[in-house]
C-alpha cells in the first residue's frame, strides 16, 4: 500500500520518492542524506519519527514488494535475477530477507 506522501515533512517525502525510484541501486544512509541535504543521524531519526518505521525497513519493504510483483508476473524468473533487480548482490541473503518478509521462499511464493 502506498504511503500518503502529503502527511510527511518535505524531506521525508523526498526520501520516499527517491527510494521508490532507486530501490534497485545501492542505497546508503549517506547517499540518501546527501540527496536530501540532511545530516545522516537527523535523517534517520526524522524518517523513523515521521513514518513509524526505520529507513532501511522501509527500503527493504519497497524492494520486497517489487520482488513479489516480479515473481508473481513471471513464475519462471530466477531468484538471482530478481535479487539483482531489486538491489541485492547476494541471492542467498535476498532469499532470507524475502522469507522474513513473506513467510515463504521466493520459489514457494511463485507456486502459491
Protein language model features and the residues they cover:
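Short helix/strand-capping hinge loops at secondary-structure junctions
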Residues: 22-27, 54-55, 105-106
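…primarily DNA-binding HTH/wHTH and HhH modules…
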Residues: 96-112
